[in-house]
């Protein structure tokens, strides 16, 4: 007695591909939402004065999937009176894009404080980005569990 397969294999693979794409889209959305939350938290953290608004405006993220741009969030922020933060946005995007392109084989979210002096501000004891990024795993897990 022989067994004969009557299933259309191409339809089976089409369903598998559709489910794979659905899962990928869900994980990409979870990454995006987690990055947005972390960036928003970092921008709301008020431990330093940003006279030019460049440092706070340089905080943002970029998301790439296998080398392809997905989304980003960089916007003007701060209440300083010596600038509008536009330089911060440009620098933040530049640094994030450079970092994201080093991993063209993966889904990658890069969160940055793009001004060159961000590390020095943190070294003085002010929280620019580190405190928010320490919550990244918890925030991402929250969105993944909601899938």
Label each PLM-derived region with a short phrase.
Residues 1-15:
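Short, intrinsically disordered N-terminal pre-domain segments
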Residues 14, 18-118:
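Short, low-complexity, charged/polar segments at coil/turn and helix-coil boundaries
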Residues 122-147:
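Protruding loop/beta-arch "assembly-hinge" segments enriched in small, turn-prone residues
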């Amino acid at each position: 007695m022989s067994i004969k397969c009557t299933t259309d294999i191409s339809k089976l693979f089409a369903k598998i591909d559709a489910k794979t794409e659905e899962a990928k889209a869900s994980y990409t959305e979870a990454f995006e939402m987690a990055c947005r939350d972390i960036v928003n938290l970092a921008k709301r953290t008020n431990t330093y004065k940003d006279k030019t608004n460049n440092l706070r405006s340089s905080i943002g993220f970029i998301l790439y999937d296998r080398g392809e741009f997905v989304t980003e969030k960089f916007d003007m922020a701060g209440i300083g009176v010596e600038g509008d933060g536009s330089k911060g946005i440009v620098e933040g995007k530049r640094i994030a894009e450079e970092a994201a392109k080093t991993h063209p084989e993966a889904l990658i979210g890069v969160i940055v404080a793009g001004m060159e002096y961000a590390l020095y501000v943190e070294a003085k004891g002010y929280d620019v980005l580190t405190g928010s990024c320490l919550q990244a795993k918890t925030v991402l897990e929250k969105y993944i569990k909601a899938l």
